[in-house]
């Protein structure tokens, strides 16, 4: 969801399994940025002490309490984005530097997404940084999500996204 009190383009992302929806395994702030060459990237920010903001997708007061000081840019985790006929697709920058600690083990993230007017698909997989072997994530392919709500009316005009 948009975080209009932060820098333009700031979006709150919570990822949780349906059976533990109140305890997200990932909460981030994503911030798209147009580059001088016309390309688009999405900067990926961790949130310090993230449990404070769990449920922020549905709780306006929690969203409002997120401040720039709470954010830490995740080095190596920027998404490189391309426009497609259906919308956009992106993947984490190359180099195996987007490090993620999962179940007490370090891994590097390989992540891709496709975004359209009707939904999105995403796949996240972790790999061992020493062996490059798969250690976590989807085995059966991308997760597919249908769009059920729009928060476009929460995007402030001053963001000038068009």
Write out the residue ranges for each language-model feature.
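Short N-terminal edge-element motif at the start of the domain
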Residues: 1-25
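Calycin-type beta-barrel ligand-binding domains and close structural analogs
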Residues: 20-162
């Amino acid at each position: 969801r948009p975080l209009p009190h932060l820098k333009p383009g700031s979006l709150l992302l919570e990822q949780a399994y349906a059976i533990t929806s109140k305890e997200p395994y990932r909460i981030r702030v994503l911030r798209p940025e147009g580059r001088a060459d016309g390309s688009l990237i999405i900067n990926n920010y961790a949130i310090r002490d993230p449990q404070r903001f769990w449920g922020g997708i549905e709780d306006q007061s929690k969203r409002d309490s997120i401040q720039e000081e709470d954010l830490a840019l995740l080095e190596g985790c920027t998404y490189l984005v391309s426009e497609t006929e259906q919308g956009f697709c992106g993947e984490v920058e190359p180099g195996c530097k987007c490090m993620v600690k999962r179940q007490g083990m370090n891994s590097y993230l390989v992540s891709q997404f496709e975004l359209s007017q009707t939904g999105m698909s995403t796949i996240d997989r972790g790999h061992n940084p020493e062996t490059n072997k798969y250690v976590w994530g989807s085995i059966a392919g991308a997760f597919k999500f249908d769009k059920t709500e729009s928060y476009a009316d929460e995007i402030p005009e001053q963001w000038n996204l068009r």
